[in-house]
Amino acid sequence: MEDFLRGMQQSTLTTSVLFATPTSIPIIAAAQEALRDTLQQPTSLQRAAAAVATSTSSDNVQLKSSNDSTINGVVIGLLSSFGSAILIAFIFLIVYFFKYTSSGRILLDRIGRPGEYDDEQAFAKEEAEALEEMDDLQRTEYLRAKAFVQSNPPDSLPTDISLSQYLAIQEKGVSAWEFEPELEIANCFVEARTEIEFFDSECCTLTNLPVPKQNEVYYWESKIYDKPENTLISIGVATKPYPLFRLPGWHKYSVAYTSTGHRRYNQPFSGPVYGPQYVQGDVIGVGYRPRTGTIFFTRNGKKLEDVAHGLKSQNLFPAVGANGPCTVHVNFGQSGFVFIEANVKKWGLAPMTGSLAPPPPYGSEQGSILLEAGREGAQSSNGHYQPDPRHGRTRSGNFRHGPPTSPGPIRSPTDISLAQLTHFPSHEEPGEASNSSTPAPTGGVTQQSGLGVHDNAQPPPEYTSPLPSAAGSPRGSTDSERTPMLRRKTTPPPIPSYNDAVAQRNRSHSHRDRSGGRRERSDSHRARQGDGNPSQS
């Protein structure tokens, strides 16, 4: 029994150790303590689970910490970049404020362009300083130009292209543009529309038409043909009305590139350096972009920087001025440009040729006025010009007008004389016959023989239709313009025999002998009558 109880205790202890389940069987205190110690110690499975849980939690903590560090790095980088940009912009604004708003100036347009400050105080200060340095003549000219601009503001006159000017551009092309010199100043001379010659005083000239605004870019060039060293040339654009006794670029609204290398934009006092100086032989180009109102210049085919912006509402005219003797030739597009881009893209003011047809050739076509003015048949009875219908041609080439219906002087082909012809004005209406009764001329006018004037007793010979042309002649060809519409078939004449030829020869000799005898008898009869007349007297 004790052995059985002892075995049960061992099995219960083993079961409790393996399954960690408390037993209800009473055991001894030592066994209970041993069991308690065993239960308190973790098993290998529990150790593995605890290790896995610990590693997972540590990985989660590390991943979370790495994500937080990445986000923090990105945020710090963005904040540093924006902070640097804001700092640079702030520094730039400070420099800009102290540089461009000094002396009470107010900037109304872009940076770094002269003449764009509309501050009255600053302009008055510059004007006072400039007037002190001017001599009497320069001061007078400046005050005169100032008064002109005040009384004639820019664009105060209608300068838009009218319908008639538009039609002229369509007909003439680029030849519609030409420079108009001021006749009152008479200091420049324009030849062949675009060749300008200046003399000894200051003046400028503008074109008759403004620069169009339909295309993307318009461009024109000026070549310096003759320029002394002390002559100042100013090339650019200006609005109308403009004081023509001043150079372009000196007053509103005008932009110019001077021969000293400076640019003038509404600046009568001074201008900054813009580009290299140009001398005799150089080619200066002016470009205009209507959509943005941008003006740029070129020198010998090389583009320079833009000068002005925002000139979109004004009508700009090409302008050339000088203060001394020089010669400038302007190319609006009638020939090739030196600036390659403008030459390829056709930046001229208009096409080279318009739709206007050339004048008709003068000749015998459709009764040319130059040829018909000296002929007697050129005017009808009422004094109006009537073209000769015999000179007309049609596209068919075979149509021919009939003979003229109005009567004219009738001459025989054999009556040739160098004497002066006597002209009798015709009072017949067109369509009447040429042999109608005509009152005899009075006033002692005598008719001379051999002049082709016939009386009623001897009417002119009847006109017959011309013989048909031979098959091989130009009139006989069906493709020729001289081919008559009515053609008759002709048969070749028969070839006479030898007997017929001898008989015809004998008949001609006998006819000649009879006519000679008649002539001798008539001469003898006239001689007898002449001898008898003196005896009767």
Curated annotation (Swiss-Prot):
Q: Which residues lie on this side of the membrane: Lumenal?
A: 95-537
Identify the glycosylated residues: N435, N506
Q: Name the Pfam families for this protein.
A: SPRY
According to the UniProt entry, which residue ranges have a biased composition of type Basic and acidic residues? 513-529
Cellular component GO terms held in the UniProt record: endosome membrane; vacuolar membrane
What residue spans carry the Polar residues bias annotation? 433-450
Q: What does this protein do?
A: Components of the endosome-vacuole trafficking pathway that regulates nutrient transport. May be involved in processes which determine whether plasma membrane proteins are degraded or routed to the plasma membrane.
Query: What name has this protein been given in UniProt?
Result: Protein ssh4
Q: Which organism is it from?
A: Botryotinia fuckeliana (strain B05.10) (Noble rot fungus)
**Gene name in the database record:** ssh4
